[in-house]
Amino acid sequence: MNDENRRAGAADLLAPLHPSDPLPPFVRASGASYFTADGREFVDLNEMRVVLGQGNEAFTQAVTDALHAITAPKNVHVPSKEHLISLLDWATDGAFAAIHLTSSGSEAVESAVRLAQKLTGRSEILSFWNSIHGRTYLSSSMSGKSQRKAGYGALAPGVVFLPYPDCLSCPMKRAGGCGFACLEMASRIYETASAQDACAVIVEPYQGSGVIVPPEGYLKKLQDWAKARGMLFIVDEIQSGMGRTGRLFRYQQEGLEPDLLLTGKALGNGMHIAAVLSRKPLAKEHLHVFAGGSGDDAVACAAACEVFRQLDSGLLAHVQSVSRTLQEGLTALEANEHVLTCRSCGLAAAIVLRNAPTCERVHHALTQRGFLPGRQENVLFLKPPYVVTNEQILAFLAALRQELST
């Protein structure tokens, strides 16, 4: 095969992975920016994993040092793992009796559900419309989005979906000030569409798909609702945890007491690691659900420890500062005739436009101007790396205002 055919073949193989707006090749990167061979800069505004930014020398050194040590120890003490466990314990105020490391968020979700089933002796799991919990069989079955399930065969049994409090699209047309009518609807669904045998309810403290933020007090009411029915309360912070909201975990801002807490993505800064934290201590017979796996890989643990170190050394305060800049800009943007609403939770935001064609046009124009937000239908979404600067956010907002005025 000659070089031209080889390049064409590679393009065909990668076609499903290419964005709708093809980007030029990048030759280097730094912080939240990518650069082309001719010096053009593109600011990444949609990166949930590599939160410490590109070219982070301290992170690279921490991982390199770990690679030079024992990388896959068996039945021995691993300093990076022990340190990470202590950091997770510290970050959650010592509220959890057991911590298990996994190699992905999907694995963490499935492990948590299996553990909840074992602890309660029940089988069903309650999830939410529009939720995202992973790509594996059970975790995708638990995700409330048709794109994750339609056409892929039979789903895992025992999953019951409840309405998430998306006030903009309230199915009862009672947005705001309704006393959480969607929770009343959840009660009816549970009574009529399930065997009333739920081991747990699993919820994202804000939904990663669309950055839908529940009204204040809803999550606490949901927790009380679940516990009154004998269910465990699982908080999935795989997207929201490890600093995205300006706090290490959003459940702390809401005053929640989850039975099981999940975290991942930002935890490893691109390395494959996630965690399940259990409030209840685990007996020996519970440990089989966690047997095997590679979540406690020494290199991934070292990576996560470095994420904690940088968050504690000023990066978390930086996230809070940039989040305020973003929130102020989004509040002003809501006056634009093309904008239906803006939603945000720390450094996660969604700009909901009135129609999809406008959103597609604006997204394309922003890409050409060197900004890389995400897009889904009529929503632009922002989940930048934590090192994004106030200046980069302000430049993006200025470009967005200009494109919305044309």
PLM ranges: what are they?
Residues 1-406:
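Conserved N-terminal phosphate-binding loop of PLP-dependent enzymes in the Aspartate aminotransferase
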